[in-house]
A protein has these predicted regions:
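Non-catalytic accessory segments flanking enzymatic or RNA/DNA-binding domains
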Residues: 3-158
Length: 158
């Protein structure tokens, strides 16, 4: 679960390696999005286990049922928030469509080993895929976002 500005859909979800996504609310401002997220995080984790993300595709969830359960569980506090902030300040999206994502991965690693360019500036391996911000090599994974400002060279070998 997380906050995504509508102009960043689906870019942010792809960058995070999401297998599925479902918009569930639209709010008037950033502060309200934080308040809604604070409510819902009582029931839904907002952290991703990056190692599990890179071990393969997770079983799909029934996101519509999850959304409906959250709406039922938090109906009163969400309604109170909208009443406090004004009509239309919190719009629950009951009919949004689930979005499924797939990534070009030929083989997921059995054990996750993370490359760190600060500790070892030379990384070699056969590219097995890309998921979110991670390159998956047969020698380990590398978080490209972590090394955004680094200058690298790439050599392709047969």
């Amino acid at each position: 679960m997380g906050i995504t500005r509508h102009t960043q859909v689906p870019t942010r979800w792809l960058d995070q390696g999401a297998a599925q996504a479902l918009p569930i609310a639209r709010v008037r401002n950033r502060r309200l999005s934080g308040l809604v997220e604070d409510l819902l995080r009582q029931q839904v984790a907002d952290k991703t286990n990056w190692r599990a993300l890179l071990k393969g595709d997770a079983a799909p969830l029934d996101l519509e049922a999850e959304r409906d359960s959250l709406f039922a569980q938090f109906a009163q506090p969400l309604a109170a928030l909208e009443q406090q902030e004004g009509p239309g300040s919190v719009e629950l999206l009951n009919n949004a469509a689930v979005i499924d994502f797939s990534y070009p991965v030929s083989e997921y690693p059995n054990k996750i080993t993370s490359h760190n360019l600060d500790k070892n500036p030379l990384v070699a391996g056969r590219l097995q895929g890309l998921k979110g911000q991670y390159l998956i090599l047969d020698s380990g994974v590398i978080n490209l976002r972590k090394f955004t400002s680094y200058q690298v060279s790439l050599a392709v070998m047969d």
